[in-house]
UniProtKB/Swiss-Prot annotation:
Present in an inactive conformation in the absence of bound ligand. KITLG/SCF binding leads to dimerization and activation by autophosphorylation on tyrosine residues. Activity is down-regulated by PRKCA-mediated phosphorylation on serine residues. Gene3D superfamilies: Immunoglobulins, Phosphorylase Kinase, domain 1, Transferase(Phosphotransferase) domain 1. This is Mast/stem cell growth factor receptor Kit. The gene is KIT. Belongs to the protein kinase superfamily. Tyr protein kinase family. CSF-1/PDGF receptor subfamily.
Amino acid sequence: MRGARRAWDFLFVLQLLLRVQTGSSQPSVSPEELSPPSIHPAKSELIVSAGDEIRLFCTDPGSVKWTFETLGQLSENTHAEWIVEKAEAMNTGNYTCTNEGGLSSSIYVFVRDPEKLFLVDPPLYGKEDNDALVRCPLTDPEVTNYSLTGCEGKPLPKDLTFVADPKAGITIKNVKREYHRLCLHCSANQGGKSVLSKKFTLKVRAAIRAVPVVAVSKASYLLREGEEFAVMCLIKDVSSSVDSMWIRENSQTKAQVKRNSWHQGDFNFLRQEKLTISSARVNDSGVFMCYANNTFGSANVTTTLEVVDKGFINIFPMMNTTVFVNDGEDVDLIVEYEAYPKPEHRQWIYMNRTATDKWEDYPKSENESNIRYVSELHLTRLKGTEGGTYTFLVSNADVNSSVTFNVYVNTKPEILTHDRLMNGMLQCVAAGFPEPTIDWYFCPGTEQRCSVPVGPVDVQIQNSSVSPFGKLVIHSSIDYSAFKHNGTVECRAYNDVGKSSAFFNFAFKEQIHAHTLFTPLLIGFVIAAGMMCIIVMILTYKYLQKPMYEVQWKVVEEINGNNYVYIDPTQLPYDHKWEFPRNRLSFGKTLGAGAFGKVVEATAYGLIKSDAAMTVAVKMLKPSAHLTEREALMSELKVLSYLGNHMNIVNLLGACTIGGPTLVITEYCCYGDLLNFLRRKRDSFICSKQEDHAEAALYKNLLHSKESSCSDSTNEYMDMKPGVSYVVPTKADKRRSARIGSYIERDVTPAIMEDDELALDLEDLLSFSYQVAKGMAFLASKNCIHRDLAARNILLTHGRITKICDFGLARDIKNDSNYVVKGNARLPVKWMAPESIFNCVYTFESDVWSYGIFLWELFSLGSSPYPGMPVDSKFYKMIKEGFRMLSPEHAPAEMYDIMKTCWDADPLKRPTFKQIVQLIEKQISESTNHIYSNLANCSPHRENPAVDHSVRINSVGSSASSTQPLLVHEDV
């Protein structure tokens, strides 16, 4: 067959040669008669197999040129014949023959190659809303199901449509932005088998439908001459084809522009253009425009530069600089000011010498380019002596400026003196502002309101202070020798604020001659009166020397440097929800007594439940107590109600304040104070932790019994007086009480609580340290300072739970050797921080010092601190020189480290109680910590009605505001 084709081709060539030879004898052909060349074979398509020959002939009277196009690539041949001896798939394409007249004919050749069904050109680009051609033409037009398929079997988007052309490829219609990075294959069925082309990834160029987004870093700049000007312009668009530039109002400005571009996502192109003037000049001031445009349109944004030769400050008072305010009222002095560069120093000055800190300064706007500020001076409850000049001073690196307010305090007149002069004159001296007027009035008898005016003889005016802002003093006098009748003279001073009066009462009597007996009697009377006065003074002095009952716990209201301002406990509210009926209290034995009062064991019926009885401790005054002691006990009640409940303080349960003497009902702690508990347990102390011994089996909760025997045991509530002996209970039939875990819950029948006969070990001491630190952290969170933290002021109750207390009236400090006379007070000197001893400063940090002494007591099993050292001048000197106690016998090294940090001479270097809790928490066993955490969630008492408590405010040396309100309570 191939031989027959060659023979036919030979005849075709021969015919062509004959035409060429005879062409010269034929007439010329006009352009209108030109026809396209002829291609042999005369087909529009030709299918050959790979390896076969491709032979194409082009006939035309003139010269011809062959062009081969495949996958957008062109090849040319100037011969009339195009021959490919061994065809390949890449020879698939369109062959075009063009004559001299530009007319052409084409034939498309398919080179069928089973190994290469598709011709592929992998780069695939498409513009949004336009068509995109996937160049994967076929080499075999006879295959079926020619289409597109997603990679890895993934489906194509539902809205994707395409048109398949075996010669060109597959055209995706109306490309969308969502098609970006779409992976696909061309596919077809060949011989019943699906064939896939190489992978195509569609990259979509977004259609531009909006102008670029342009923004600058700041809308305006203010600079001093010589400073650098740098402004950043950010351009956002969907593609990088956006154009941008800076346009300067002053073309002479020398500026540099740096460009930085990047893509942030597929269709988010960003460009930064930073314009910089290294040293700005005044004539560089003006408008700078950042301009950007794309095919849709343009956008721009401007920034303004103002360059000044030097900085400035302009102050604008927001009120009249002359201010009148009444005595006791508040006034705010407000100024606004512009400053560039930023102000470095701002201050309010009183009378050009005294600084005041009751002011605040803040920017007028949060805008970065803001140069306007506001300063406010808050003057509260002004007194008459606080009038004067208040000056606001502000300065920056270049200039300073000020404005002065003249504040006048209007005060009600005050009668300073009213005297009878030797020359028969009555003189009245009054002071006030504005200038008071003094009028004189006369009335017969001893009336307190006179209406008959009397003209003054002499009136003098003087200023009561050096400055013109003080009270004005008026002297006025009248002659009373003209009055012939008994009566009253009123001196009445008044101004716009108010008035005040003083009265003179006088009577005219007959002259009486002295009697000879009168003088000795008068002398005797004067001597007796003098002696009585001396006796009264001595008794008063002794009374004042007597220690007064004072609430040790102090609640801090604010801190000014090293000065603590305490809340007056008498001003704290008392919620009558704490009231408990007196007739439901059944009093028992006295637990302890002091100079001012006593604590009595009692049974309260219906305190927790209506049908339940509970053993409580009731604090009350002695019948001989004075008013100050009664007020102090009420203050103690208010402080306890303010604090609220915590497991490690002696909590308030109720009170009786109506219908009789004040009674304060608190928790009853049956094991007494911790100091004597430690001393009792010295002989049975186990040096290692109890959990390491077999005795750990004894530590169990006993919840099946119905009554507590604690109240039946020997009373060891507290050491009220020296010399009281303590006897360890020895009932043979008592079971050993639970060490931890039998704490009373609100709705649970109380567990049996027996006298604690178990031994003491190191884990117990760590537990006591941890609990007391938790309790003190709670007090500190309520801004409460204890001032007398010691083992004697820690009580112990069921489950070896420690509770911090304030004995107050119930301790006989007069006979307690721990309290040393210092001035007219008795103080626990060995427990006090140096700043408390020498400067009478009590702070949260001084409580931390006392806690360190408490730890020493604890790990020495109740020894007295600074053993063998009397409190004398030598003791004070050693404390000043930094003497500290050595580690107690049973203290681990970590606990002694805590003691030493608590005894740091610098209060600010001492840890807080919260930090101490965290340090000790690392040393106690996990079981103890877990049990304590469970107990802390129990609330054994009725709800505390007090609300809105406070967290600890800043302590000594705090950098925060010097005066802070009480904040919302945070849990400890």
